[in-house]
Amino acid sequence: MARYRHSRSRSRSRYRRRRRRRSRYRSRRRRSRGRRRRRSRRGRRRGYSRRRYSRRRRRRY
């Protein structure tokens, strides 16, 4: 009985860890997007529209 309970708790912890990692990845993506936008203002040419680029990236994701 004790062994069964232990395995059950382990599976639950694994699921929780997976959820946490997912949220962390989402937050990192948001942060990277802001940083890239700031950098793109300097690096990219004026003719390339930023709105179209962001829309394409979002659709790809």
UniProtKB/Swiss-Prot annotation:
Protein's GO biological process: chromosome condensation; sperm DNA condensation
Domain of life: Eukaryota
Compartments, record wording: Nucleus; Chromosome
PROSITE patterns in alphabetical order: PROTAMINE_P1 (PS00048)
Tissue and organ expression note: Testis.
Region Disordered, residue ranges: 1-61
GO MF terms held by the record: DNA binding
Keyword line: Chromosome, Developmental protein, Differentiation, DNA condensation, DNA-binding, Nucleosome core, Nucleus, Spermatogenesis
Any one annotated GO CC term: nucleus
Function statement: Protamines substitute for histones in the chromatin of sperm during the haploid phase of spermatogenesis. They compact sperm DNA into a highly condensed, stable and inactive complex.
Similarity field: Belongs to the protamine P1 family.
Protein's name in the database: Sperm protamine P1
Lineage of source species: Eukaryota, Metazoa, Chordata, Craniata, Vertebrata
